[in-house]
Amino acid sequence: MAHNAVYADMGDMVARFGELEVLQIADRNADGEIDADVVAVALADASAEIDAYLGRFKQPFAETPPILRRLACDIARYRLTATSGVLITDEIRNRYKIDVLELLKALSRGEVQLGLDSAGAQVATSDSGVVFANSKNRIFARDAT
C-alpha cells in the first residue's frame, strides 16, 4: 500500500555521510552546492523501495522507525553514487546489497520487527529500532545468584 511518505531527508543524509560526500554524489550541475531536488528524488525512490518490502505493515507509520531512516539513506547513497560518476566503494555496495536488502527481506518475512505498536507508534526498542525476541531458555533473571 503506497503512502507517499519519505523516511529521511537531506539533513539525515548529511548527518550520516557528511556534507562533502553528499555534495560529491548530489551536485549534478557542478555549482559546488548539494542539489536538494536530486537528494529528495533519491530519498523518495529509496522510500518506495522500502515500502515494496513492507506491505505487511500498517502504513503510514505514526512515526518513522529509526531503522527505516537509516535504510533510506543507505539506499539513496548507493543510487546517487551509481549515477554521479563517483566510485562505488565496497563499503557502499555492501551496505546496500548485504545490510539493506537482507534486512528488508527479513522484515518482509517477519523475522525482525520494526518496534511499533498496533497503532504504528514507536515502542521502546534497541538503538537500531529493530526488535529481536527469543522467549526460550532464559539465562538471567532478577533473582539469579
Q: How would you describe each model-predicted region?
A:
Residues M1-L68, S126-T145:
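Conserved short "hinge" loops at termini or chain/domain junctions
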Residues I67-Y78:
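Core structural elements
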Residues Y78-T145:
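Short loop/turn elements at secondary-structure junctions
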